[in-house]
Regions:
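Hydrophobic core positions within the conserved protein kinase catalytic domain
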Residues: 62, 116-120
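Structural motif at the C-terminus of the N-lobe alphaC helix and the adjacent alphaC-beta4 loop
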Residues: 60-71
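Conserved structural core of kinase catalytic domains
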Residues: 51, 70-109
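A short glycine-rich, hydrophobically flanked beta-strand micro-motif that places a catalytic Asp/Glu
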Residues: 73-78, 124-136
């Protein structure tokens, strides 16, 4: 892991790897005592998802989601040449962590359902997997920018909610089976 990365010539100290997704690696980065998420796009194959231009998709999906009013981290900067984006860091446990620790509440489920009430009329689904939702000060944020055209089979009620409690699907995932 690199100790420093730049976005459009501005250097950020890389603290740790936060996670790897379908489209890139997300790092906790710092500059002047402030925390950020720095995402480096990757081009590793993904058997269940087809990508076009990932940087363009990040920018377009952010604008689309922002227009719906769901809570998500601010897109601060994009470095097209290096295929990196800089996002606001939302500090807190993931919904996955909360389920594992038996701390998932009806209030958090209600907040993701409220996001659906904003997304579905716009013809959108997001990735409802609980690793990409973070709770900060009892407020749930969707920390990814991925969104897709609405399909009933991939909505919260038919797919995502299976991973928001200790269901068979959740336990299979935690014990090594793949959910995505």
């Amino acid at each position: 892991m690199q100790k420093a990365m730049t976005i459009n010539g501005t250097e950020f100290n890389v603290v740790s790897l936060l996670g790897k997704g379908k489209g890139g690696y997300s790092y906790l980065a710092e500059r002047d005592g402030k925390k950020f998420v720095l995402k480096q796009i990757h081009h590793e194959p993904c058997s269940y998802y087809t990508f076009g231009n990932k940087i363009e998709a990040e920018q377009n999906d952010y604008a689309t989601l922002k227009s719906t009013g769901i809570r998500l981290p601010k897109l601060i900067d994009t470095d097209v040449k290096q295929e990196r984006i800089l996002k606001e860091f939302i500090d807190g446990p993931t919904a996955m962590d909360l389920v594992k620790q038996d701390k998932m509440t009806d209030a958090y489920i209600g907040q993701v359902k409220e996001m659906c009430r904003l997304l579905y009329p716009a013809g959108l689904n997001i990735d409802y997997f609980p690793t990409i939702f973070v709770v900060q000060n009892d407020v749930l944020f969707y920390i990814d920018y991925e969104c897709n055209n609405y399909m009933e089979e991939w909505n919260l009620e038919n797919w995502g909610i299976k991973y928001w409690s200790k269901t068979k699907e959740f336990l299979d995932y935690v014990n090594g089976s793949s959910a995505q």
